[in-house]
């Protein structure tokens, strides 16, 4: 296969400053003694600004932290935060960068249900601001409720479309194999629950 990719009409190299990446929690060394404010300020590094810590940029950092609901934790060490709070810190960092596209890698892993709901509320608010949210996940539970559109990948694109329609049995077999009945029981509105009837 061959072709080209454009992001907002630009080549990926030119558009990379418009993309903010939120990594998996377990890929980060949390032993560094950094506060929430300091991590979010890292979003200013590399921006076209002569003074990254000007009053204007400091205000942008604080606004991003407020937007994700961490105002009271702004000076707290990040290694004392919960998994959901850590995800919110990195979302705030990408907002400070001015990213137009947010790419979240396994955003809901090691995060309890309540924290997942908080994250989805924040993500939906960001989406309303006109930003694009891409989330990589292996968890298909409640996928129709969380996402507008889904792309299913297994070495190639198995399916792409509306989240309420794309997860057919044929697509699930292509992604996970016909032997994996846990996934094959999934249909829109059915998350694998079985009461034995």
Region spans (language model):
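ABC ATPase nucleotide-binding domains
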Residues: 168-170, 174-197
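Catalytic Walker B motif of ABC-type/P-loop ATPase nucleotide-binding domains
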Residues: 102-106
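Conserved ABC transporter NBD signature motif
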Residues: 2-15
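Conserved ABC ATPase signature
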Residues: 77-81, 85
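Conserved ABC ATPase "signature" region
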Residues: 41, 55-73
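H-loop/switch region of ABC-family ATPase nucleotide-binding domains
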Residues: 137-138
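H-loop (His-switch) and adjacent beta-strand-loop-beta switch element
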Residues: 150-163
């Amino acid at each position: 296969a061959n072709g080209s990719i454009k992001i907002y009409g630009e080549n990926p190299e030119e558009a990379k400053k418009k993309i903010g990446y939120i990594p998996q929690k377990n890929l980060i060394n949390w032993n560094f003694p950094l506060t929430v404010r300091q991590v979010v300020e890292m979003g200013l590094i590399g921006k076209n600004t002569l003074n990254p810590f000007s009053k204007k940029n400091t205000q942008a950092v604080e606004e991003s932290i407020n937007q994700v609901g961490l105002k009271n934790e702004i000076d707290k060490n990040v290694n004392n935060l919960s998994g959901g709070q850590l995800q919110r810190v990195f979302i705030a960092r990408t907002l400070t960068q001015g990213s137009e596209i947010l790419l979240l890698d396994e955003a809901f892993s090691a995060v309890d249900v309540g924290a997942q709901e908080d994250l989805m509320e924040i993500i939906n608010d960001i989406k309303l601001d006109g930003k694009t949210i891409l989330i990589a996940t292996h968890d298909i539970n409640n996928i129709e409720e969380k996402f507008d559109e889904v792309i299913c990948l297994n070495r190639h694109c198995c399916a792409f479309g509306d989240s309420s329609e794309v997860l057919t049995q044929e697509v699930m077999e292509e992604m996970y194999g016909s032997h994996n009945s846990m996934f094959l029981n999934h249909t829109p509105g059915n998350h694998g629950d079985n009461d034995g009837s």
